Structures are given as structure tokens and as C-alpha cells.
């Protein structure tokens, strides 16, 4: 029997899809190339709240360059977001859904110029765009610049563009020093230009750490020149670079769930897409980790309302999945929250590592990011032991002195309710390479606002953050 060549064949050969993904051998999700730490992850987390940081986003995301007279139509047809009023020098958080209304992924779309866009984000939404560009009769050209290898093994790495963010309460001081004068603070997700070391650099008003800042990018060959200039200008303001260890944990404070399971494994309307996706695609090799267990892969799917993307849904245009979303009552859907994990229970998890007489310790909780799969799914339980939600992104904030997770829970559960998160996997753990033999623990966790950071809740200008759960 020949080896599978596409996702549909992988699924047919793999038996139960949940079992296949929960036992994937892909390993941990890696943020490649960037050094794990430049100082230490605690100081780096502290700096994005108290001084300024340089995030290096050059290597861990797919860049998809989309050009042509149908480029805007391709995006409009595949996104829940409204295309009305979208024009060059504005960006959107692009969210596509399946014909059944479930989220595929998300990313940022930069409207660079007439008929010219770039998507930046994880693979699932990029793959969806490429599929429709190739099969939908659109007059577009696509350049796919894949993320850097997770383990380059000493080989040179090349991208089309470098991508940084300058963030933190003193970020604008750094930015204006670099620029050589006052720089207008544009509205959220608006684009402009600034000067860095004699170069004209494009900018996006953005923030990931709960304070206004800029995302900036340029040709890859100018990366070192730009980076050195930023670090030099930032010295007097306490700016430090953030490594790949701390970087992904910033979303625990700002409230974005980066990795919902792409909801494409079932449904006749998606069969052609599964046949298009190669056997080594993100979707075919990705891993699910956590205590939530169902034999039905669809129980891991989420719709936009469940992870805070309700404000993006606009029925002012035709798009894939519109009919399914129109049939949903948003008020009855699960809602995104932060769960603040109990400190005493966390101490118990770590104490178990030093218990020489126990048969097994609790699942290791890595710091600052505790996820151990591409897609994370821990069961959230109420006092009666009923599953009332799914915890989807987990780690520790040195700024808050808390273990936190981003979750979607039943809509009627108010902020302040104590629930439990079942930490670890059943029966000693699955066969994933990231899972050691362990036992499970029910960790108390209080339903809390999202974003958890007060700064993020009060200063963000865009999208779902203004519709944050606060009560």
C-alpha cells in the first residue's frame, strides 16, 4: 500500500482522528531561530509591562503575498470580517471559517497597496487562502514564504522580510528617538512609515503586550541594521529584546488564543480541501494536547463567538460560512475568559516533582508557557464535575504572579466563579513526545476578565478587546 499523499488519505489510514492527533509525534510547537532568552524570561516579561521590548516575529509565521485584481475579492469571500471601507494602509485580523461556521485559524492581513496584500500568521489560514486562490478562479498571484524550520540544524535561514514589534509603556519614546522626531500615533491597525537608520520602514499601529506600539518590517537583508539601531535607541528607555521562550506568553495577558484546532477534518463540503492539503501539512501532523477527551473531533472545533471573534462577524458581504453563522444565536455560545489558577495547587504540581515516594508526579508545567501541543484542550469542570468549557492556552505571567489560561466556557458562568482545570492527560498520558508518564490534577481556577491585564483592557483600541469579558 502506497504512503498517503494528502490529508484525506492520512485520515483514512489513521483511524480515529482524535487518537491520531492526540498521539502525534511532531513534538512541541517551536518558535524557531530566535534565541530562547536574551536576559531571562522573567525580566523580559517584566519589561513589556514596565519599560519597552523588542519582539522578533521574523521566523515563526507564514507570510503569504497576495497580488492581483481579485485579491480583495479572495479575502472578502473567505473572511467573516467586513471588507467595507478597507483600503491601503489598513490591516485586519483575518478570520476564515468553514462552510459549517467553525474557525480555521486567523492572522493579520496587511493592505499594502492597490491589489497587494500580505497575510502573516499560522499555517491553517494561509493554506485555506492558497487553496481558494488556486481552485476558485481568482485572478491572483501568490508567493508563499513559509515559516523558518523548527530545527534548522545549522543550515542558513532566509525569509523575504524581517518583522519586529516595539512594545511597552516606553515604546513610543524609543520609536520617536529612532524616527528622529514626533511620529503620529495612528489609530489601531493603521499603517504608515518611519525612519530607522536611514531606511524608510513600514509600520502598523499594534500592541500585543497591553500598551501602544508598532509592528515594523523590511527586507530580510536589512534585519541586522534595523535591529542594532532599535537596541541602541532603546538603551536609555530600558528596552530589551525578548526571546522565543517569553514571547508567546504575552498573549496570556492580552487575551488572544493563537491556536484553535483548524476545523477541517470532517464534512463533505471540505473533502476537496482535505484532498488538496499534503500529507505533511500542519493539519496532518499537528498535535492535540490536554485532558479534554472525545472520540468526535468536532467536539474540539470552535466558532468565532466562542473565542472572542464575535465583533468581527459582519453579514454585510457574502462569505464562506455565512449561512452557518447566521443560524447561530451569539448569546447562547460559550465565551472566552481568562482562568486564574490557584497558587497553592500550582505549588502542589511542582512539589510532586520532588516526591521520591510517589508512583507518579503531576504533568510538568513548563514556564512561562506550559502548552505541550499545537492545539491545547484541557477540560474545564464545574463543582459537580460537569465539563463546562475548554482551556486552550496555558502559562505563567511573572507580572501577575499567576498561572493563567485562556479558555472558552459556558456563557452563563460569571466572572468570579471558581472552576477546576483538569491538568494532565488520562491513564498516564498519550504517546506524544512532549508527554512524560504522569498523573492528573484538578487545579482550582477563578473565571477572570479577558484580557487579564488591566492595561490591555483599558488601552487596546481594536476589535474583540473592546468587547472584553469583564463581568
UniProtKB/Swiss-Prot annotation:
It catalyses: vanillate + (6S)-5,6,7,8-tetrahydrofolate = (6S)-5-methyl-5,6,7,8-tetrahydrofolate + 3,4-dihydroxybenzoate; 3-O-methylgallate + (6S)-5,6,7,8-tetrahydrofolate = 3,4,5-trihydroxybenzoate + (6S)-5-methyl-5,6,7,8-tetrahydrofolate. The record marks 60, 247 as: Important for activity. Changing residue 62 to A: No change in activity on vanillate. Its EC number is 2.1.1.341. Substrate binds at residues 31, 60, 122, 247-250. Disruption phenotype: Disruption of the gene leads to significant growth retardation on both vanillate and syringate. It holds the Pfam family GCV_T. (6S)-5,6,7,8-tetrahydrofolate binds at residues 57, 93, 120, 165, 215, 256. Pathway: Secondary metabolite metabolism; lignin degradation. Keywords: Lignin degradation, Methyltransferase, Transferase. Optimum temperature is 30 degrees Celsius with vanillate as substrate. Belongs to the GcvT family. PANTHER family: AMINOMETHYLTRANSFERASE (PTHR43757), AMINOMETHYLTRANSFERASE, MITOCHONDRIAL (PTHR43757:SF2). Involved in the catabolism of vanillate and syringate. Catalyzes the transfer of a methyl moiety from vanillate or 3-O-methylgallate (3MGA) to tetrahydrofolate, forming protocatechuate (PCA) or gallate, respectively, and methyl-tetrahydrofolate. Has similar activities with both substrates. Cannot use syringate. Uses an ordered, sequential kinetic mechanism. Homodimer. This is Vanillate/3-O-methylgallate O-demethylase. It comes from Sphingobium sp. (strain NBRC 103272 / SYK-6).
Amino acid at each position: 500500500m502506497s504512503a498517503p499523499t494528502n490529508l484525506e488519505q492520512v485520515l483514512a489510514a489513521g483511524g480515529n482522528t482524535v487518537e491520531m492527533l492526540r498521539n502525534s509525534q511532531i513534538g512541541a510547537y517551536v518558535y524557531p531561530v530566535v534565541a530562547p532568552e536574551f536576559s531571562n524570561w522573567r525580566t523580559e516579561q517584566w519589561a513589556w509591562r514596565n519599560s519597552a521590548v523588542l519582539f522578533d516575529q521574523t521566523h515563526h509565521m507564514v507570510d503569504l503575498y497576495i497580488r492581483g485584481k481579485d485579491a480583495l475579492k479572495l479575502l472578502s469571500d473567505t473572511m467573516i470580517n467586513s471588507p467595507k471601507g478597507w483600503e491601503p494602509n489598513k490591516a485586519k485580523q483575518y478570520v476564515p471559517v468553514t462552510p459549517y461556521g467553525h474557525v480555521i485559524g486567523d492572522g493579520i492581513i496587511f493592505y499594502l497597496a492597490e491589489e497587494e496584500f500580505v497575510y502573516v500568521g499560522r499555517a491553517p489560514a494561509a493554506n485555506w487562502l492558497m487553496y481558494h486562490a488556486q481552485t476558485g478562479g481568482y485572478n491572483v498571484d501568490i508567493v508563499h514564504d513559509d515559516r523558518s524550520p523548527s530545527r534548522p540544524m545549522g543550515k542558513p535561514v532566509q525569509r523575504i522580510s524581517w518583522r519586529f514589534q516595539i512594545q511597552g509603556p516606553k515604546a513610543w519614546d524609543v520609536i520617536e528617538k529612532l524616527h528622529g522626531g514626533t511620529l503620529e500615533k495612528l489609530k489601531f491597525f493603521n499603517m504608515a512609515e518611519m525612519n530607522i537608520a536611514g531606511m524608510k520602514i513600514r509600520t502598523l499601529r499594534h500592541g500585543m503586550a497591553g500598551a501602544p506600539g508598532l509592528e515594523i518590517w523590511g527586507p530580510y537583508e536589512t534585519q541586522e541594521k534595523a535591529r542594532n539601531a532599535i537596541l541602541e535607541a532603546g538603551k536609555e528607555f530600558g528596552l530589551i529584546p525578548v526571546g522565543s521562550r517569553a514571547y508567546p506568553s504575552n498573549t496570556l495577558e492580552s487575551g488572544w488564543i493563537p491556536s484553535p484546532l483548524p476545523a477541517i477534518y470532517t464534512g463533505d463540503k471540505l473533502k476537496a480541501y482535505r484532498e488538496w492539503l499534503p500529507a505533511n501539512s500542519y493539519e496532518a501532523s499537528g498535535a492535540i494536547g490536554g485532558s479534554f477527551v472525545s472520540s468526535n473531533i468536532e467536539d474540539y472545533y470552535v466558532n468565532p463567538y466562542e473565542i472572542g471573534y464575535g465583533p468581527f462577524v459582519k453579514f454585510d458581504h457574502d462569505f464562506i460560512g455565512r449561512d452557518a453563522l447566521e443560524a447561530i444565536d451569539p448569546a447562547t455560545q460559550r465565551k472566552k475568559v481568562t482562568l486564574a489558577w490557584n497558587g497553592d495547587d500550582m505549588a502542589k504540581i511542582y512539589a510532586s516533582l520532588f516526591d521520591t515516594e510517589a508512583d507518579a508526579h503531576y504533568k510538568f508545567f513548563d514556564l512561562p508557557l506550559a502548552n505541550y501541543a499545537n492545539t491545547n484542550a484541557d477540560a474545564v469542570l464545574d463543582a459537580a464535575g460537569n465539563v463546562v468549557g475548554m482551556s486552550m492556552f496555558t502559562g505563567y505571567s511573572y507580572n501577575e504572579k499567576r498561572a493563567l489560561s485562556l479558555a472558552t466556557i459556558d456563557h452563563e458562568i460569571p466572572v468570579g466563579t471558581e472552576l477546576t482545570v483538569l491538568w494532565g492527560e488520562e491513564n498516564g498520558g498519550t504517546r506524544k513526545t512532549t508527554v512524560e508518564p504522569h498523573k492528573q490534577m484538578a487545579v482550582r481556577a477563578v473565571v477572570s476578565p479577558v484580557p487579564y491585564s488591566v492595561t490591555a483592557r483599558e488601552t487596546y483600541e481594536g476589535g474583540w478587546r473592546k468587547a472584553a469579558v469583564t463581568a
